[in-house]
Amino acid sequence: MSRWSVSQGCGNSHKALRMSGNREQLLSGWGAPGMLRPSMRSEAERQRSFRAWPRSCPQLSPVELARSGFYYLGPGDRVQCFSCGGVLRSWEPGDRPDTEHRKFFPSCPFLQQQQRGPGATDSVDGQVLGQLSGEEPDRTWEPVYPEMSEEQVRLGSFSTWPLDVPGSPEVLAGAGFFYTGHRDHVKCFHCDGGLQNWEQGDDPWTEHAKWFPMCDFLLQVKGEAFIRSVQESLFSSPEPSPESLGSYDYDRSLASSTESVSVPRAPTPGERSEPPKVSGPPLSTEEQLQRLKEERMCKVCMDKDVSMLFVPCGHLVVCTECAPNLRHCPICRAAIRGSVRAFMS
């Protein structure tokens, strides 16, 4: 299994991740929405999400991050906007959430609503975002798979677990996972987080806290201190070798179908990334709809809508049926460590 550690730390250049069919890139506008939590429309709930925020990060205020529309996503210092789905990481000392949000995602509906003033209607979903901050927050998420809530039921799902795969079914089931029946792919019954490519010595609880720190089941069983310690350890991890990250040669035949935004040159160490410049005449409504349809199309079967978000690369390029058959992301070729179902709005 190809391992991945958060090597960006808190002193490298920002990277914005787009939850769509494009490879990891900086954006200048709002794209197809990714995996968004409805409860994070509440500013108070966004503040609560920062319970596991690594203390080794720069002194960024969770209050300021939440006010700017961000909630904690993890691993490391990754945050996501509840409205546009934009993800930012690698925060530097002196960064201001509002400034970075506007720099990388200037077309965010939440930002646009702030400029229009309270009570303005959001043009994307027709809701009044100004009223959402007063919405009663969802204190606890219901399990995605309630039928797997019992540990013994989860353990029973491992009856066909491959004998040559590392990992104890008892420990995996105790950590909230059940077996999907595909190779070594397991899922959390509560947060729907999926993990695969297990290695000898991997601890299910630690991996759960590393990749899905906002899982309510994880929080209830292990507590904030455990999750925070796991997230803190990511910043002290050594730089990953090229071999551990896997090949990042892009499949141009696949990438060509997701060319809605040009891919900027990768920044050199210490260089500050700037958002790409958009050129050319604006697209018509019909062209925008066609492009959005192409973005949402599974890049493997070219039939169903994309619905599975790969971890750690963050690409959303395949449907639920095609995802279990892949071991590497078809866009960046990075080893797939886990996956999460993405709900498209």
From Swiss-Prot:
CDD domains per record: BIR, RING-HC_BIRC2_3_7
Chain positions found as Phosphoserine: S237, S241, S253, S257
Species lineage: Eukaryota, Metazoa, Chordata, Craniata, Vertebrata
EC class of the enzyme, as a word: transferase
Entry GO MF terms: cysteine-type endopeptidase inhibitor activity; cysteine-type endopeptidase inhibitor activity involved in apoptotic process; ubiquitin protein ligase activity; zinc ion binding
Family: Belongs to the IAP family.
Residues that bind Zn(2+): C188, C191, H208, C215
Name this protein carries in UniProt: Baculoviral IAP repeat-containing protein 7-B
Gene name for this UniProt entry: birc7-b
Reaction equations catalysed: S-ubiquitinyl-[E2 ubiquitin-conjugating enzyme]-L-cysteine + [acceptor protein]-L-lysine = [E2 ubiquitin-conjugating enzyme]-L-cysteine + N(6)-ubiquitinyl-[acceptor protein]-L-lysine
GO terms under biological process: apoptotic process; negative regulation of apoptotic process; positive regulation of protein ubiquitination; protein autoubiquitination; regulation of cell cycle
E.C. designation(s): 2.3.2.27
